[in-house]
Amino acid sequence: MTKISAILGGEQKLKDIRIRKFELGGHTFKVRIPLVSESDAMYAKITAPEDQKIDKIYGELTASLIQFKEKESEDFKFTDNDVIVEGRSMRQAAKNKAMIEARVIEYIKLLVPEDAEQTLENITYEDIEAEFPFAVQMTLVKSIGDVISPSYEEARG
């Protein structure tokens, strides 16, 4: 137990203080505010997705483009490890998609389950994608972000 938790009544009370709520689509979601160390770990996962994940997404994005490899085209340029489509790197697009997926996962993990016996620690993007369309995912991420990072007006009081 830390000094603060001892003074304020225990670690459970501190955990309760770190939970905030927001409403979306008529449902009230509870969000656990991460500690600074947890936020740093989340940021690291989001900004540096695993190479395997990027390669998998890259393969999915470029699978249908292989047919254009032998054809001369200004729209498609094939390099040793990338495909450039209309000036845009598919490898960078894959990394961006992996970063978005990681952000969705990490933010969803901050939700407090209705049933205390349940956990979101092992949730995958595929699980989330099966439940929520992309627009809802982005709305959830924005709402969770608003809760865990108060605006200047809220912080100022």
Task: Give the positions of each predicted feature.
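Extended acidic low-complexity intrinsically disordered regions
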Residues: M1-L14
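Short acidic-hydrophobic surface loop/beta-edge motif
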Residues: K15-G26
